[in-house]
Amino acid sequence: MVGNGGCFCRKICYNSVILFEGEPDLKLSRLVFPPDGASRGTLRAHRAYLAVLLTLLGVGIGFLGLWLTACADAALPQAELYRSYLDHPLLLALNLFPPLLLAWLGYFLSGRCWCGVLLSGLFGVGLPLINYYKVMLRGDPMRASDILLLRTAGGIMSQYEFERTAEVNMAVALLGAMLAFAVLLMPRGDKRRRARALGAAACVLLGVVAYLGAYTDEAVY
């Protein structure tokens, strides 16, 4: 056991040396804001930093949307409904996948993490927000066919007065905080256009495959 543990530690140290090679005294400020002409080790560490945080923000937006969906109907037990999402790993993954995918797609298309967070938030929080008010005003949840009736719905919704509830305020505030974090602490993106184009194409391909596979299968989703 001791020998295996020693080998494991040596592997971690070796991989860390490779990642930060050429930048032994890498500081947090250089990790977040790599200067022009930074070494390859710094740029690798910066890309890893962006990848981890962008993934966490995309998943966080997905959880925020699920929470807002659980709060839509006051007649239902919100805690139990939200827990039901967490109790089914496959269903949870399918609900978190679109916001995460859109976060990466927005990043690859623009080269800026905050654009990915904004695109993910418009879908991952925007649609649950529309569903929240539709349940509050009409008593029935939002369906995919409702997207095709947005113009008509806009005329109908103008007749209602929307109440800014605590749940809505919290969701908007948290999304705003995520967006501000991405703007301030994830400012620099990948300048390699070819790599970003390949990444965007991969996101589109994954989205199409997921939609035609899991999301249209009633036995799965």
Task: Please state what every model-predicted region is.
Residues M1-V2, L26:
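Accessible peptide chain termini
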Residues G3, R10-I18:
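Short, positively charged and aromatic/hydrophobic N-terminal segments
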Residues G3-G6, G22, G37, G41:
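Residue-identity detector for glycine
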Residues Y14, K27-Y221:
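Transmembrane and membrane-interface helices of multi-pass
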Residues L19-L26:
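Short, positively charged low-complexity motifs
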